[in-house]
Amino acid sequence: MEPKFWQERWARNQIGFHLPEVNPYLLRHWSHLSLADDAKVLVPLCGKSLDLMWLASHGLRVMGVELSEQAVETFFSEQSLTPHITRRGAFTVYQADLLEVWCGDFFALGAEDLADCTALYDRAALIALPPLMRAQYAEHLNTLLRPGCQGLLVTLDYDQTQKAGPPFAVTDDEVAVLFGLKWTLEVLEARDILGESWKFVQDGVTRLDERVYRLVMR
């Protein structure tokens, strides 16, 4: 899956993955993390998510990472924010108060970029990636983040033979393989959401489960 794929999705406004509201799982489960009041939160593949604003509104320092320049500029425009724009290595960084969005390739991040990140929020990053890239993504997080980091991870699970991704199916077993050696994993919530997902029903999917994990890096 090349960067061009996502850039074209944004250019065509094919962004069904975008939620027009703060994610309910974030509202329900962020309090399960034991974080400093001003913790820095990494939000990979953030798009123009309203979750960024919610996190910043709670005094957290937010570091979104997004490939699409259009997504980043749309986010700041829609939130009526005028960012300060700088270059940091391979990234263009848009900053407004507690909020930073790094525009560029997530895989170009180095350990120094994430040195003060003590929290992770992944609502739509892992499930946006095909299998090989999921392994690379997890390994990147496992390598760059530090012990004690805590996070929320949201996944979808369905029969991948019934529908092509994205979003891709990620099983509980795969989460354990990707993160189990480095993180303590706890399922906070699991729901059957097929009845709420007409597009999946239309495509012939017969099972659709959403899970929310609490992760603590060891």
From Swiss-Prot:
It catalyses: S-adenosyl-L-methionine + a thiopurine = S-adenosyl-L-homocysteine + a thiopurine S-methylether. GO terms for biological process: methylation; response to metal ion. Gene3D superfamilies: Vaccinia Virus protein VP39. InterPro entries: SAM-dependent_MTases_sf, Thiopur_S-MeTfrase_Se/Te_detox, Thiopurine_S-MeTrfase, TPMT. The keyword Ribosomal protein does not apply. Its EC number is 2.1.1.67. Keywords: Cytoplasm, Methyltransferase, S-adenosyl-L-methionine, Transferase. The keyword Ribonucleoprotein does not apply. It is found in: Cytoplasm. One of its GO terms (cellular component) is cytoplasm. S-adenosyl-L-methionine binds at W10, L45, E66, R123. It comes from the Bacteria. One of its GO terms (molecular function) is thiopurine S-methyltransferase activity. Belongs to the class I-like SAM-binding methyltransferase superfamily. TPMT family. HAMAP family: Thiopur_methtran. This is Thiopurine S-methyltransferase. The gene is tpm.
